[in-house]
Amino acid sequence: MRKFIGLNGNTIALQNKFYNSSGNVPFWAMPKLLNQTGNSFMFRGLPDGRYRDKGAFAFQGEYRHSFKNRFGFVIFTSTGSVFSSWNDIDFSEFKNAYGFGLRYQLRKESSENLRLDIGFSPNEPMGIYILFKEAF
């Protein structure tokens, strides 16, 4: 689910995702805390697939600020966890990531941006991402 809130010409963007599986799920098909290229992008700063189990929940938020000269910046944060069953969800085990990014609007008549994001997560290597379009 996504929600976008206008704030004096800027945007607060919110997103949450929930995945659940049952039965004998192969490791490669298990839900994970996401770090995917393309338009779906959560947990920038956390290595892809590091945390997997039968269920996953993730939330992220961004503050997007645009300048009049086609440049802008974002600050973002993510939190979430994986779990084997509903009874195993432990909020003290949630993983967190955060960071900032720069934006360049490719054409004035389009909302497509070139973006550079730098993400951090405790005890993980810094992530650097150069992509087109917003994370979500």
In which residue ranges do the predicted regions lie?
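Membrane-embedded beta-strands of outer-membrane beta-barrel proteins
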Residues: 1, 14, 59-61, 100-102, ...
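C-terminal outer-membrane beta-barrel translocator/porin domains of Gram-negative envelope proteins
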Residues: 1-67
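Transmembrane beta-strands of outer-membrane beta-barrel pores
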Residues: 3, 18-24, 65, 77-83, ...
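Short coil turns and loop connectors of transmembrane beta-barrels in diderm outer membranes
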Residues: 7-10, 67-69, 108-110, 124
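Residues that define the transmembrane beta-barrel architecture of outer-membrane proteins
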Residues: 10, 53-57, 92-98, 124-128
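Transmembrane beta-strand segments that form the barrel wall of outer-membrane beta-barrel proteins
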Residues: 11-16, 43-49, 73-81, 85, ...
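Outer-membrane beta-barrel translocator domains and adjoining extracellular loop/strand segments
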Residues: 25-33, 85-92, 127-131
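Outer-membrane beta-barrel "beta-signal"
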Residues: 99-109, 125-136
